[in-house]
Amino acid sequence: MAPTILISLALAVSCCVLIQADFVDFFEQKPNEDGKHWALLVAGSSGYYNYRHQADVCHAYQIMKKHGIPDERIVVMMVDDIAHNIENPDKGSIINQPNGPNVYPGVPKDYTHEKVNPKMFLEVLQGNVEAVKSMNGSGKVINSGPNDHVFVNFVDHGAPGILGFPREFLHATQLSPVVKKMAKDNKFAKLVFYVEACESGSIFAGDLLPDNINVFATTAANAHESSYACYFDNHLKTYLGDVYSVMWMQDSDKVNLNTETLSKQFDITKKETNTSHVMEFGDLKIGQLTVGEFQGKSMAVAVDNSQVPNPNLDAVKSEDVKLSILEQRLLRAQSEEEKEAIENELEIVVAVKNTISTFKNIIATAVNHQLYHTQMMFTLKRPLTQHTCYKTVVEHLKTVCPGMNLPQNDFAMRHFYTLVNLCEEQVVTDVIVDAMEKVAMETKFCSV
């Protein structure tokens, strides 16, 4: 046989061996005999209008639980103001789909009320018991190690580079270094994020989530669009779920988690969610692993979802949820007194939506009322790269205009892209801050 042919054959065999070795090495990183599954489930909102967020998280808990992840390795963070809320006619109950089961029973109350905040979340995720206890937390954390798989499900409002909590923001630039440090410190074998929030794709975009640290993330929306609520319930007078969350959980409820891969679940969720663009980030090879490697491997009785309505049919943008709920309630008002009360609340909601004018004033002042630039700032949606400027101006706006209640004002958050544009246009941070202070002094809405 000619030498050149022998060399070619040797190279081909070597390549096959290397590819096979890489393939085997990747899949041998599943939790071994000592490896464990951990889950951190977070609903970052409060208030009955946000019923759906805690419903999503409670449903996620039930999935993890029935597939064998024990309570000591499931951490739940939610304000817990829904199940027994005065507006909830079915006390002690939370459902995530029309006529669905009560998903509230058994859910651990690990972190509730004011303990649902960004700092607590980051410390819990990193397994920092002492730091958590120093903030009067329970001490229950994700105590994962190098052989473990960690699943994080976050549900709330969002904005460019931001995830909301009841009173504060979690910035992508706070989450990213924590995740990178966890990878460096061997705090997991694999880490998976499922994130339900508006503009959630911006949390992992660019170099915020590298593709070589064993982390995989999927998000409900891209970096520039809203996520959607679904399943308005006439009896409960609120939305029961969010489209992306409902889609992946209804899939997990009915399939064999030990055969379906994360990539397959992503594809199903992406296809079925036609209200926003479901995205994936990070190490996409992790998608070849089964869903059970992160949501639990024990077999469970499949749920028949064939009679559940399509969540896309009544889907509404997250920022329009409160307005939509009030309009639905107004249609069903039983008395003039009830109708008047709802109309008064509607007026307040409309006033809140008018906060866009506040943003316009900030922009106009910051660019010296140059009409072209002002229009451009409201037309473009630039990728966020100037994180330092952006974080500074967002936090300053929250401080000087507390009346906006920004962390829970989803409509105002939809216009944070204007602040992104200012920073990306290299407008000096101090100029933007000064403009905010001037507008805040002239705007009654900004006062508490």
Feature-to-residue mapping (PLM):
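Cysteine endopeptidase catalytic domains of the caspase/legumain-like
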Residues: 3-448
